[in-house]
């Protein structure tokens, strides 16, 4: 099953937060996909789910604070029981304008020096039913927010090449889809059958033309969608009119 631990909206007593995290329990494995932006929200939502055990794998969709900084709770409570899977660019210093949006430096140092870190660029199979995408090819046009990062001592445009997703028994879980949600899904189809797509679609502030293209794309698909996090209210409103739309929030449990 998949449990939504962090999202911008929450059900009943659960806590909402700008960010994303999901717990995937499959084939006797516990996989934490992202960790939200701080310890408090992750801790409290795990408590409300009555989740006390550690994680066999941690997968980072990309190196932004709202997906990684909740790892402080995981590290401090010794809940990492296995590999941490990430792209090398997740550890770059990242900015939105003058605002630092990368991974907290203490967390970054721990992951790089003490964790069993698996750096990937190509698809990585955890087992026969679980695959992490690695780098997502950008074959279809998409609109992207302007980010910067530090490379070789210089501040340059960040293409967010560390953007990755995970597929568990046909359910595609994406953190922010900085590669473009159509690119994410179409690449996912090359790796696995797709039965559903959930997570951040990153459609805040996009043009009407692009948003309409996304809506038409999902209207033509035969799997369910659960847009969350950075999808945005306007896009959620339009996507919610589709027959394959499912509402997602913290506290949601999805069977797989």
Swiss-Prot record:
Xref: Pfam families: Lactamase_B (PF00753)
CDD domains, per database record: DHPS-like_MBL-fold
Domain of life: Archaea
Coiled-coil residue spans: none
GO molecular function: transferase activity
Family per record: Belongs to the metallo-beta-lactamase superfamily.
Name under which the protein is recorded: Uncharacterized protein MJ0448
Organism (species): Methanocaldococcus jannaschii (strain ATCC 43067 / DSM 2661 / JAL-1 / JCM 10045 / NBRC 100440) (Methanococcus jannaschii)
